Every structure is written in structure tokens, then in C-alpha cells.
Amino acid sequence: MKTAARLDRIPPYLFAEIDRRRDEAVARGVDIINMGIGDPDKPTPPVVLEAMHAAIDDPSTHNYPPYKGTKAYREAAAAWFERRFGVGGFHPDTEVISSIGSKEAIHNTFLAFVDPGDYTLIPDPAYPVYRTSTIFAGGEFFAMPLLPENQLLPDLEAVPETVARKAKLLWLNYPNNPTGAVASLEFFEKVVHFAKKHDILVCHDNAYSEMAYDGYKPPSILQVPGARDVAIEFLSCSKAYNMTGWRVGFVIGNRTGIAGLGQVKTNIDSGVFKAIQQAAIAAFGLDDERLHALMAVYQNRRNIIVEGLRSLGWPLEAPKATLYVWAPIPKSFGSSVEFVGALLDKCGIIVPPGNGYGEHGEGFFRIALTVPDERMREAIGRMEAAGIRFEG
């Protein structure tokens, strides 16, 4: 018995590998500080839990949900989007669809639009699912390097015309995982122009839209005039509402994009449990003060890590958004894998290597701000005690 040949092209999922290494270390008795995965350690807000409890007690939530989400959920998602980004008029029946978090919807979008021989334009480094989903769909991906000299934004002019003509999807993710980079509306305007020129669907993974610091508010690509002609945006309750395990979000924007995704979803999944949708509606109604309090926690953690690494010689700027700090490895290490292995072996610290996010992630590692302050300070202390410093 043999698995499909496509699996030979797909490496082990980065975060599953992190979990495996964590479990092995814990089994050896190592006190692990796991800063490998962006899984918030704070609880889901009480009002969301209360809505969930009430919905579970309602027998009408116990049967199959609508494939594209309940009407109430899609209306609430569209209303939240309008309040947050100032862009309204999205029809809940044709321009909004529920999703099982973001990962499922991202993967299914590739199945909806990519045929064998088609190209997808993928940032590098990036969330690994963009690359693997291209392979599952039978397409080819063209890596767009995110380079410091371009403010970690892809250079669309560097995409060869022969590739652009065959491209079906252009993927973006700002605020960016893993780099923490942000994008302006001016950049998104260039993206929309490029997509219209080449008849490409822009897929903006905006999972970190609410995870920003120092008063910064990340934009939506759909704020650009004409963007809904070529773009869809993926949003999730996971990070902003501490609901990673609940698996609920939505996709909004271009009708063809939503229809294609919906056609795949109706044949693959059976929607989101209606009680979870009710809970998410309650989350959409939370005021900004709760989010500000949450982000104050993450901002303090960001400062602990950035200042701690600076004290060990790292040349870092504090990221404006996301739950991550993206940092270079010391030159004394030959690769990012070697460096993160040393952190695990010498310090009991788990972080992912940059090359797990693509070729242009080599030479970097990512720190997730999802452990308590005291454990972050302890991590810096362990690195100092082990003699791990940055040497340019």
C-alpha cells in the first residue's frame, strides 16, 4: 500500500514537528519553554463562553449547520467588518462565508481556483500552508521573496510576465507571519492594479488584523477602491478572541472568490457548529477596551523579548503587529535548524527555524509571544547563562 505521490513533495508540517520535539523533550524531563506556536495562553472572554453555553442548551443548534454559515453569523461578520474597516455593502449571501478558522478556507481556496499547470504567487517566508496547498491542488508556486530592502513586501514587478499570465492566486498576509511586517494601503493599491492587469484573485490572509501595538491599526485590502473586484480576505476569531481551538472565522469579498470557495466547502465539510457561530457573534460584539487590554499584555511581552535579545547583542526593531518576533541567528551557527536545535538542547527553549517558512526564512528564527512574562524573562536568562549571544 502506497500513499499518493503528492505527499512525497510535502514535508512534515512545521508545527506538528515542533509538537513532536516538545513531547520528546518533556518525556526526558526537560522543563520546556515553548515559544514555537502562536497559540494564545489567555482564556476565551467570558461573554463568549456564556453565549456558547446558552447555544449548546438550545436543541436547534444540534443539527447540521448551513454550509456557508448561518444568516445571523454572516450578517454579524459583515457588520463587524464595516465597523472595523469602514467598508460596507457586503451581501451576506454572496460575499461572506463562514470558515473553520482560516487554515481550512485557505486550503480549499486553492482547490477552488488552481488547476494542474497553474501558478500561485506565494510570499517567502510565509505560512507553510500556502505552499503545501498549491501542491495538493496540482499547481506550481512562484516564491516572492520578502526582503528587508523592500520592507518585507513582495516586489510585484519582479514576477516574470510568463508566470503572471499563468497565475491564478496571489497570496498576501499582513500583518505578516512570521516576520511581523506590515503593509500600507498604498501597497495594497499596487496589488489591486497588478491583479486586475493579470486577472488574478488576491487572497489576503488577515488573521492578525487586531494584533497590533503602539496604536497601529492594520488596514484591509478591501479598503482600496475596486479591491472587491479581485480580492477576498480571510479573518479569524482565533487570535483576537483567544479562540484558536474553536475553529471559526469568515472570508469576505469578491463574489466569484466566495462562490468558488463555497462550492468546494459544500463537498468537503459540513460547516461550523451553530453553537460556535453563536459564540463568535458574541465575540464580534465585544468593545475595543477588551482588545486594548489584551494587546497591552502582548505589547509588554514583545518588549521583554526585544529588550532581552538586544541585551544579548541582537539588532532588533520592535514589530508593529502580530504575536511574533522575527530575529536573525548568530553567524556562528550554520543554519536556522542548527540554532534552534542549540536553543532546545542548551536552554530547553522551543522556537521554529526560519527555513520552515521558506527558503528566504533561512538565517532567522521566530519567537511566539504566547507564554507568561516570567517565562519569557527566564528564556532570556537561560540564553545568557548558556552563552548564546548574537554575533554579526
From Swiss-Prot:
A Pfam family it matches: Aminotran_1_2
Recorded GO MF terms: L,L-diaminopimelate aminotransferase activity; pyridoxal phosphate binding
Mind telling me which PROSITE patterns this protein's record contains?
Answer: AA_TRANSFER_CLASS_1 (PS00105)
Reactions catalysed:
(2S,6S)-2,6-diaminopimelate + 2-oxoglutarate = (S)-2,3,4,5-tetrahydrodipicolinate + L-glutamate + H2O + H(+)
On whether Transmembrane helix is a keyword of this UniProt record, the answer is no
Q: Which of UniProt's keywords are assigned here?
A: Aminotransferase, Pyridoxal phosphate, Transferase
Record-linked Gene3D superfamilies: Aspartate Aminotransferase, domain 1 (3.90.1150.10), Type I PLP-dependent aspartate aminotransferase-like (Major domain) (3.40.640.10)
Q: What is its EC number?
A: 2.6.1.83
CDD domains recorded: AAT_like (cd00609)
Q: Where does substrate bind?
A: Y13, G38, K103, Y127, N177, R366
Q: What class of enzyme is it?
A: transferase
Single Gene Ontology BP annotation? lysine biosynthetic process via diaminopimelate, diaminopimelate-aminotransferase pathway
Q: Which residues carry this modification: N6-(pyridoxal phosphate)lysine?
A: K239
Question: InterPro entries this protein is in?
Answer: Aminotransferase_I/II_large (IPR004839), DapL/ALD1 (IPR019942), LL-DAP_aminotransferase (IPR050881), NHTrfase_class1_PyrdxlP-BS (IPR004838), PyrdxlP-dep_Trfase (IPR015424), PyrdxlP-dep_Trfase_major (IPR015421), PyrdxlP-dep_Trfase_small (IPR015422)
User: Which metal ions or organic cofactors does this protein require, according to UniProt?
Assistant: pyridoxal 5'-phosphate
Q: Which residues bind pyridoxal 5'-phosphate?
A: Y67, S102, K103, Y127, N177, Y208, S236, C237, S238, R247
Q: In which pathway does it act?
A: Amino-acid biosynthesis; L-lysine biosynthesis via DAP pathway; LL-2,6-diaminopimelate from (S)-tetrahydrodipicolinate (aminotransferase route): step 1/1
Its annotated function is as follows: Involved in the synthesis of meso-diaminopimelate (m-DAP or DL-DAP), required for both lysine and peptidoglycan biosynthesis. Catalyzes the direct conversion of tetrahydrodipicolinate to LL-diaminopimelate. Can also use m-DAP instead of LL-DAP as the amino-group donor.
**Family recorded in the similarity comment:** Belongs to the class-I pyridoxal-phosphate-dependent aminotransferase family. LL-diaminopimelate aminotransferase subfamily.
How it assembles, according to the record, is:
Homodimer.
Q: Which NCBIfam families match?
A: PRK09276.1
What name goes with this protein?
LL-diaminopimelate aminotransferase
Origin organism is: Gloeobacter violaceus (strain ATCC 29082 / PCC 7421)
